[in-house]
């Protein structure tokens, strides 16, 4: 995975299968975003068997098959959906098209694993909720900046164990490198990507809910701007939002497309979680000017100051839990309510945001 390319962020984990070979079969459909590689890597490491891939672009399919030699290129989407052995379809279509794909998947009795953002409008969210209710299938979401980042996984464990007491504030920053020349046309169209708070903001707002311990939140302010890309009038290169959760935890998120060329990775993503007995800072992808590696956890508690480098130490339990949820009809990886609550918060923030001109 190129460290400078956030669009193709796909961590390589360690195999930790939760099932026997052939017990869990999945397919990939919709290759518009490189997150599909991280989604597939996680499921394969957890014991999943990748059987099919489909996309209308044969070049994308050829690249995918080269990366996963055991997968078969499907002649059509319908060939994937008609295969009764396929239990889940992972999809990273253009954001505005993700719900339509998911509805087709669930209507064929299969579970759906969508890249973030899982939809771009509140109407699409209503359709997805209705689809889940009518089919009984899961609509899982790849909020990768928590699920596929070991420092974030470890922070969740620390909080659950009471390391910093009661959480009172969560702050997340998610800067990304633009790499404009590599972006497809839909990337610049707000109607297609959903707005910056819906798109990359979804990573941060989901973490506020998770670390803050509530799926209910009120937006107190939200802003977006297009400071440096006027040639794309509907694009947004900056956004921030303040929220208050139902349990009184406060949160702040900032996202942007201004990672400078001098940074050694695609974005200096950080999270700071304040508790009554201490605080945690995550330096997810780099420790600037100190360490080129990521997954640094800084913990300050009653006992002192602690630097915990956790890369390669924690793993990514979400994927195995998702497979077991499907095989055993449970809900341990992430509740459907949480997946949709995070999406709704992002969509509401995008809709309410004041656009700053300048």
What spans do the regions from the language model cover?
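Contiguous beta-strand/loop segments that form the cofactor/metal-binding neighborhood of enzyme cores
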Residues: 2-17, 206-287, 318-325, 330
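Beta-loop-alpha module in the N-terminal Rossmann-like domain of NAD(P)-dependent dehydrogenases
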Residues: 17-19, 68-131
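Oxidoreductase and adenylate-handling cofactor-binding alpha/beta cores
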Residues: 148-172, 198-227, 239-249, 352
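A contiguous active-site-proximal alpha/beta segment in oxidoreductase catalytic domains
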Residues: 96, 119-181
